[in-house]
Amino acid sequence: MEEETHTDAKIRAENGTGSSPRGPGCSLRHFACEQNLLSRPDGSASFLQGDTSVLAGVYGPAEVKVSKEIFNKATLEVILRPKIGLPGVAEKSRERLIRNTCEAVVLGTLHPRTSITVVLQVVSDAGSLLACCLNAACMALVDAGVPMRALFCGVACALDSDGTLVLDPTSKQEKEARAVLTFALDSVERKLLMSSTKGLYSDTELQQCLAAAQAASQHVFRFYRESLQRRYSKS
């Protein structure tokens, strides 16, 4: 279910540490990002949110198998690999959500009959994994030079038993939460690109979570900008 209503939300602050662009009113965990750290992909990025870490590699635009070829745009594929073992139902579901988000911003019509593949490797999962995957994918796409109409980011929210909203929840907070909601938002209009929800919540709470995620996305996009400025100012 998708809502784009802007509503004020009361947010419980979680103290964060590390290099991130947060102000005192933002409760996201610390961020860290490193790009161009893999040699084989066309672009790569490692994204850290608290103790959750994801490594992303982007291949393409490249040749595509005839069976997967789309005549008027690029074929976009997302592969998510868990930390241990083989991909299961949860990974396949996240792959679909991430692919839908990427397809909403990637200008695939500029590279018809090609493939763009995003490979994500979970390094550690300490909560808000889907949001971290989205952020890693975006920074890897930027590193690969894939044309996009906007950047995107993921923000997760948890609602505890008394209705308190927690942004960027840890694994413990997710387990104790009544509901966990993850949103993908673009950098131009803070437009909702994708939502994934689990648990019980009211329409009002959904709107509150979306409004909180839209506000928090400003901090994520500021971190993107400062991270890219630091990287390219060195080169």
Curated annotation (Swiss-Prot):
The keyword Ligase does not apply. CDD domains: RNase_PH_RRP46 (cd11372). Transmembrane segments: none annotated. Changing M148T: In CABAC; uncertain significance; no detectable effect on interaction with EXOSC3, EXOSC9 and EXOSC10, when assayed in a heterologous system. Gene3D superfamilies: GHMP Kinase, N-terminal domain. Highly expressed in a variety of hematopoietic and epithelial tumor cell lines, but not in normal hematopoietic tissues or other normal tissue, with the exception of testis. GO terms for cellular component: cytoplasm; cytoplasmic exosome (RNase complex); cytosol; euchromatin; exosome (RNase complex); nuclear exosome (RNase complex); nucleolar exosome (RNase complex); nucleolus. Residues 1-13 have a biased composition (Basic and acidic residues). GO terms for molecular function: 3'-5'-RNA exonuclease activity; DNA binding; RNA binding. GO terms for biological process: defense response to virus; DNA deamination; mRNA catabolic process; nuclear mRNA surveillance; poly(A)-dependent snoRNA 3'-end processing; RNA catabolic process; RNA processing; rRNA catabolic process. The modification Phosphoserine is found at S20. InterPro entries: ExoRNase_PH_dom1 (IPR001247), ExoRNase_PH_dom2 (IPR015847), ExoRNase_PH_dom2_sf (IPR036345), PNPase/RNase_PH_dom_sf (IPR027408), Ribosomal_Su5_D2-typ_SF (IPR020568), RNase_PH (IPR050080). The keyword Ligase does not apply. Its main location: nucleus. It is found in: Nucleus, Nucleolus; Cytoplasm; Nucleus. It comes from the Eukaryota. Residues 1-24 are annotated as: Disordered. Belongs to the RNase PH family. Non-catalytic component of the RNA exosome complex which has 3'->5' exoribonuclease activity and participates in a multitude of cellular RNA processing and degradation events. In the nucleus, the RNA exosome complex is involved in proper maturation of stable RNA species such as rRNA, snRNA and snoRNA, in the elimination of RNA processing by-products and non-coding 'pervasive' transcripts, such as antisense RNA species and promoter-upstream transcripts (PROMPTs), and of mRNAs with processing defects, thereby limiting or excluding their export to the cytoplasm. Homodimer. Component of the RNA exosome core complex (Exo-9), composed of EXOSC1, EXOSC2, EXOSC3, EXOSC4, EXOSC5, EXOSC6, EXOSC7, EXOSC8 and EXOSC9; within the complex interacts with EXOSC3, EXOSC8, and EXOSC9. The catalytically inactive RNA exosome core complex (Exo-9) associates with the catalytic subunit EXOSC10/RRP6. Exo-9 may associate with DIS3 to form the nucleolar exosome complex, or DIS3L to form the cytoplasmic exosome complex. It is linked to Cerebellar ataxia, brain abnormalities, and cardiac conduction defects: An autosomal recessive disorder characterized by global developmental delay, impaired intellectual development and speech delay that are observed in most patients. Disease manifestations are variable and include infantile-onset hypotonia, poor motor development, poor feeding and overall growth, and ataxic gait due to cerebellar ataxia. Additional variable features are dysarthria, nystagmus, variable ocular anomalies, spasticity, hyperreflexia, and non-specific dysmorphic features. This is Exosome complex component RRP46. The gene is EXOSC5.
